[in-house]
Amino acid sequence: MKKYIDEVLTSGHGKLYQSDGRHRVNPTEGYGTGGLLQGKKHMLSLTWNAPIEAFTREGDFFEGKDIDVLYMHFHKLNEFIGLTRLPTFLCNDVIKNLQVEKYLADYQVHLEKVFG
């Protein structure tokens, strides 16, 4: 993540974002609204070895937290430059329970749902 921030965002000043969005009149408001990519979107497509239950089950490893909670920093970084978040696609349990055909079918359904 740091490398992405260093190489993409830092060099993207003036191309990806103009400022942090705050105004001189009231510098406590408007933070995160200076992105230049308004109207564009981003979508995460992720693979995890963890089974879905590790995310969804209270008391399990991720304490019932959705994958997007774990990637909130990345979503907010993209929002900072003006991108709108699309629903994340997630393949779980990819090492101990590999199901390539299911993942491909699920991805196709996801793409059709998101992009029509």
Q: What are the functions of these language-model segments?
A:
Residues 1-74:
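Helix-loop-strand module that forms the ligand-binding subsite of alpha/beta enzymes
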Residues 53-116:
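Glycine-rich phosphate/pyrophosphate-binding loop and the adjoining helix
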